[in-house]
């Protein structure tokens, strides 16, 4: 199942939708139990996910649904999760971290080899597809990175590795330059 968020220009609101092929189906028009925004959808946890997956399967099977599909090309796409409550970025590749530190005249951090290292990033600076606003004088200092982000959809504490998949709502392509 693919989920998107877009700006509904008619209602001037954010809208979450299921994407099937090149057509988007608004969640809350498919079923009144499904919320209109991605944040509300993720807060619904298992119940909203199960219901959305059922509608996704119905659409893919060719069954008629209540929501009128909209071509994705006609939508003003936002980031899939436009307003996450938190954004954490992990250092995953030693070679990349070492090169970045070396370029700044810094030694490699020993903690990298001892435990998973992450930092809190600015969750208020999330952008969807389109042009990136960058000051030209600083462009050469940016480190463009193609990453995959895991969207954690359910609350948890000290989650064991073998249970981690149960807390992931989905994945997003991300660039955190």
Question: Whereabouts are the PLM-identified features?
Answer:
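Active-site microenvironments in enzyme catalytic cores
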Residues: 1-8, 19, 43-177
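Low-complexity, small/basic-enriched stretches
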Residues: 1-40
């Amino acid at each position: 199942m693919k989920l998107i968020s877009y700006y509904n220009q008619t209602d001037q609101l954010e809208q979450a939708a299921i994407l099937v092929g090149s057509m988007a189906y608004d969640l809350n028009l498919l079923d009144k139990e499904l919320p209109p925004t991605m944040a509300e959808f993720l807060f619904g946890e298992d119940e909203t996910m199960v219901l959305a997956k059922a509608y996704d399967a119905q659409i893919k099977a060719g069954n008629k649904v209540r929501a009128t599909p909209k071509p994705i090309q006609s939508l003003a796409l936002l980031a899939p999760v436009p307003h996450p409550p938190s954004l954490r970025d992990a250092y995953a590749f030693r070679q990349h971290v070492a090169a970045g530190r070396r370029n700044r005249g810094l030694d490699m951090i020993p903690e990298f080899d001892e435990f998973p290292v992450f930092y809190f990033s600015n969750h208020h600076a999330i952008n969807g597809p389109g042009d990136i606003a960058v000051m030209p004088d600083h462009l050469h200092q940016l480190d463009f990175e193609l990453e995959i982000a895991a969207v954690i959809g359910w609350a948890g504490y000290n989650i064991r590795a073998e249970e981690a998949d149960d807390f992931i709502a989905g994945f997003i392509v991300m660039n955190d330059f």
